[in-house]
Structure formats: structure tokens, C-alpha cells
A protein has these predicted regions:
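Nucleotide phosphate-binding site architecture
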Residues: 14, 46, 119
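PIN/NYN-family metal-dependent endoribonuclease catalytic core
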Residues: 8, 20-55
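Acidic, PIN/NYN-like endoribonuclease modules and their adjacent C-terminal/linker elements
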Residues: 108-109, 115-156
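Alpha-helix/helix-capping structural signal
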Residues: 11-12, 43, 116, 137
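A short acidic, often aromatic-flanked loop/helix-cap motif at beta-alpha or helix-coil junctions
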Residues: 46-47, 80-85, 135-143
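Domain-scale selection of a single, long terminal region
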Residues: 42, 46-82, 98
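Metal-dependent nucleic-acid phosphoesterase active-site entry motif
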Residues: 1-21
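Active-site neighborhoods of divalent-metal-dependent phosphate/nucleic-acid chemistry enzymes
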Residues: 73-116, 120-124
Length: 156
């Protein structure tokens, strides 16, 4: 069985760095232990670096260490012409490059905390042909990919 491949946007990656117990952190730890694959885009890395430098600069080293430890695949950003040609995919034009990068990476899920632009509009997932969710919902939905079903010797 192949590992589930999750594309984390900057909100999910940021949460995974600053929280020691949240679902986003758990996803990074699963990637570190080779149970899942994490994919990021160049833009996600740059956005997250800027946000951490601005809000919690002492965590910049943690971000870089987590990206290396998780063996994250970093994909190229889409070309500007490709972004312009796909503005219809999502209402917030700044999110088009993230959506396109996830689509092109052929991931199993796009993981985000950005409910307003990605999750609350179900057409985004349909148009992009992607499953999209928060770290918490994705970790529950994807559980079957990395947790074997429980089998009891007693039949329960």
C-alpha cells in the first residue's frame, strides 16, 4: 500500500510548527516516521518562513528542521500564465497557486486551516478534483491509510 500524500498549505505547516500537540504537528511527525508523505510548494515554504519570522522568529530553525525531518517533497510553483488561466477554481485569487500546486502534485489531500476559501466552498474541491480538509479532519479521514484495522484475538 502506498503512503498517503498530503499537501500542506502555509496555515497547516505554520500550525504544525508552533503547536506541540495539534493535528498538524501529528501529520509532520507521521511524515518524519515515514508513515505518510508531505508535499509543499515553494510558495508554501516562503509564506510560512515569512509568517514565522514575523510572529515567532525563534521557531524559524524548527521550521527548517521539520521540513528536513519530514522529508517533504517541495514542488515548483505554477507559472503566472497557468495561474491566470485557472482563476475560476477558487474565489480568492491568491490561493490559486496553492491549489494548482496541490493538483499538479497529484496528492491525496490538500490540508489547510483556511476554511473560508478552501473548505466552506465545496465547489473548490470539486473543480480541483481534490479532497480538502483541516489537519484534524484529514488525519481522521486518512487514518485508514496509515493505521491498520484493529483485530482482536477475542473477536471484539
Amino acid at each position: 500500500m502506498s503512503k498517503v500524500n498530503l499537501f500542506l498549505d502555509s496555515s497547516a505547516l505554520f500550525a504544525g510548527i508552533i503547536s506541540s500537540t495539534g493535528a498538524a504537528r501529528a501529520l509532520l511527525l507521521l511524515a518524519e516516521s515515514d508513515q505518510i508523505t508531505v508535499t509543499l510548494s515553494e510558495q508554501v515554504v516562503a509564506e510560512t518562513e515569512r509568517a514565522i519570522a514575523r510572529k515567532v522568529p525563534q521557531a524559524l530553525a524548527d521550521l527548517r528542521a521539520a521540513i528536513l525531518a519530514s522529508k517533504a517533497q517541495i514542488v515548483n510553483d505554477p507559472a503566472p500564465a497557468e495561474v491566470r488561466a485557472n482563476l475560476h477554481l477558487i474565489s480568492h485569487s491568491a490561493d490559486v497557486p496553492i491549489l494548482l500546486a496541490a493538483m499538479k502534485a497529484n496528492v491525496d489531500y490538500l490540508v489547510t486551516h483556511n476554511r473560508l476559501h478552501f473548505i466552506d466552498d465545496p465547489d473548490v474541491a470539486v473543480k480541483a478534483n481534490l479532497r480538502i480538509g483541516t489537519p484534524g479532519t484529514v488525519s481522521l479521514e486518512a487514518r485508514s491509510f496509515f493505521v491498520p484495522p484493529y483485530r482482536s484475538d477475542t473477536g471484539f
